[in-house]
């Protein structure tokens, strides 16, 4: 597979994976790809913990599902991320960013305009939306054959210092290498983010994984092989839309947006789902 093809096909997997274990060969390839990422002064600040134990995965899935339910029930999630929610194709076409909630139960569709109001939050809780989403999230994580914890060396990751930026930047490059490699291997990947949204929940995962004091747990991902047909959850979104080049590229200085690049280049095809 060509690199540009993998970049264009890269996506986040919102649905379930096949139950098949990820082969050790593929695990090694993924982590080799991560280790080949660039880093400031070749510091290689990243560390990874590979998780296959069903009990550990089950415990993390419980923490993730409970976190999602809580963050959505109390409104903190919607308040924090409301600039990125889209409920119509027209809005997505205008903004060209965020998440388009294009799959919703019929009972909820009339209330999308109220989702960020107190009444909307009450309605969602009445309909059990946070609980439904939390349980679906738990099942997705629990059904994943492989989790990957991403850590940084605290001797390099020192918040408030320039080394912290370098470390996070390097970690991002390592994770992008993994993400692109999943495309080549017929796999999917998704960030397990909700435990970071609720105070105390991330600490539970840190304890569960026995992360030592000299490392900082930065992220946890779920990975697995993709089924031939991917089933979408009851409430789902798409995020394939991308900003036009003239919206994020400038020429010579920041007063001059790039011109003539808004049309997709030859061979680009349609963007990936996320």
Give short role names for the model-derived ranges.
Residues 1-274:
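Acidic, surface-exposed loops and disordered segments
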